[in-house]
Amino acid sequence: MFLTRTEYDRGVNTFSPEGRLFQVEYAIEAIKLGSTAIGVKTKEGVVLAVEKRITSPLLEPSSVEKIMEIDDHIGCAMSGLIADARTLVEHARVETQNHRFSYGEPMTVESTTQALCDLALRFGEGEEESMSRPFGVSLLIAGHDENGPSLYYTDPSGTFWQCNAKAIGSGSEGADSSLQEQFNKDLSLQEAETIAVSILKQVMEEKVTPNNVDIAKVAPAYHLYTPQEVEAVIARL
């Protein structure tokens, strides 16, 4: 007896006859509703810029975290469900610290991304396994290791790709096409900041201010920009 479409919809571990996992596809669709995040890699390092949606004037802008530090040399920007992102980031932090403790060296950016995606593919661990749904979040992971700067993009299927520049979230289609036009491998870090924020400005529905944009760089150490530093980047546009 064949299951109906709705039964394939509910089962996260069941392939449909066409070979599709609908829950994973829906999670990928959910990210298209999230705030826009942009990553740009240069020879000096990687820049991340993210739109922060401040839904109320009563909200404290600094409490909306869209860029997080994983280790001294790795940071990540997110789009989608922040709680899911936090679960993945906490897992990555533990992995990087365990690696540092065991081997006396920092974990490579690719290995950290792989550890994150392994968890994404298992849909949680320990007691969370009973929840068993895909993580509704996509990440841009920026880092700097012995191989130089790198930028990775992950999605809810547990797949990851290495990119030179990438946009995720609701404005990703327009932002990606702008990145293709403006990106070149000889960009300086300062030019990458300007490009990332100017593209965010195009896709955002409101004026760009230090309250609704976060910027970070990994060059080679992770650094989240202060509101004054963000203001200086915006002033260059």
Curated annotation (Swiss-Prot):
InterPro entries linked: Ntn_hydrolases_N, Proteasome_alpha, Proteasome_alpha-type, Proteasome_alpha_type_5, Proteasome_asu_N, Proteasome_sua/b
Xref: CDD domains: proteasome_alpha_type_5
Compartments, record wording: Cytoplasm; Nucleus
Domain of life, source organism: Eukaryota
SMART domains linked to this entry: Proteasome_A_N (SM00948)
Keywords for the protein's UniProt record, in alphabetical order: Acetylation, Cytoplasm, Isopeptide bond, Nucleus, Proteasome, Ubl conjugation
A matching Pfam family: Proteasome
Chain positions found as N-acetylmethionine: 1
GO-annotated biological processes: proteasome-mediated ubiquitin-dependent protein catabolic process
Subunit structure: Component of the 20S core complex of the 26S proteasome. The 26S proteasome is composed of a core protease (CP), known as the 20S proteasome, capped at one or both ends by the 19S regulatory particle (RP/PA700). The 20S proteasome core is composed of 28 subunits that are arranged in four stacked rings, resulting in a barrel-shaped structure. The two end rings are each formed by seven alpha subunits, and the two central rings are each formed by seven beta subunits. The catalytic chamber with the active sites is on the inside of the barrel.
Protein purpose: The proteasome is a multicatalytic proteinase complex which is characterized by its ability to cleave peptides with Arg, Phe, Tyr, Leu, and Glu adjacent to the leaving group at neutral or slightly basic pH. The proteasome has an ATP-dependent proteolytic activity.
Annotated protein name in UniProt: Proteasome subunit alpha type-5-A
GN (gene name): PAE1
